[in-house]
From Swiss-Prot:
NCBIfam families given in the database record: PRK00092.2-1
Main function: Required for maturation of 30S ribosomal subunits.
Pfam family, one: RimP_N
Lineage: Bacteria, Pseudomonadati, Pseudomonadota, Betaproteobacteria, Burkholderiales
Record's protein name: Ribosome maturation factor RimP
Cellular component terms (Gene Ontology): cytosol
Gene3D superfamilies reported in the protein's UniProt record: RimP-like superfamily, N-terminal (3.30.300.70)
Family per record: Belongs to the RimP family.
Keywords assigned: Cytoplasm, Ribosome biogenesis
Location of the protein in the cell: Cytoplasm
Length: 161
């Protein structure tokens, strides 16, 4: 079985979502996990979640005699990448940065846009952003996207007790 399929099967089987998987130089394998959309109310991935997945993957990769040197498992972070259509559904209403493969002629030949993700309609994705002449809406498909990720929302104000 291919390494990516093996990792995805294991992570999904444990009740998590595989956000991303990377094979880096010198045998480093990076795995990014998150809760499934159904379990999103559980909050953020913890160190304990990463530890649990790491232990399971180490056993599976050893049994399958996978070729790797090191394994890193972590959360996708505040700037979570958006890779699948389900990511755009899940994070509709959130602020995101979207970089397209080609410039959009109807948007001043820009490739990068930052704005609020809209609920996808079929295969069509949308982003509301602030254009040169006020609010604008960009429609695109997943195939048009080079990279996309959430814009981190950090609140440094202290909580009142």
């Amino acid at each position: 079985m291919q390494l990516s399929a093996l990792i995805e099967k294991t992570v999904v089987g444990m009740g998590y979502e595989l956000v991303n998987f990377e094979q880096a130089a010198r045998g480093l394998v990076r795995v990014y996990i998150d809760f499934t959309p159904e379990d999103a109310d559980k909050g953020s991935i913890t160190v304990e979640d990463c530890e649990k997945v790491t232990h399971q993957l180490l056993h599976v990769l050893t049994v399958e005699n996978a070729n790797y040197e090191r394994l890193e498992v972590s959360s996708p972070g505040l700037d979570r990448p958006l890779k699948k259509l389900s990511d755009y559904v899940r994070f509709a209403g959130a602020e995101a940065l979207v970089k397209l493969r080609l410039p959009m002629p109807n948007a001043a030949n820009r490739k990068s846009f930052q704005g609020i993700l809209q609920e996808p309609v079929g295969e069509t994705l949308a982003l509301e952003f602030e254009g040169n002449e006020g609010p604008a809406k960009l429609e695109f498909t997943l195939a048009d996207v080079d990279k996309a990720h959430l814009v981190p929302q950090v609140n440094f104000r202290s909580r009142k007790a």
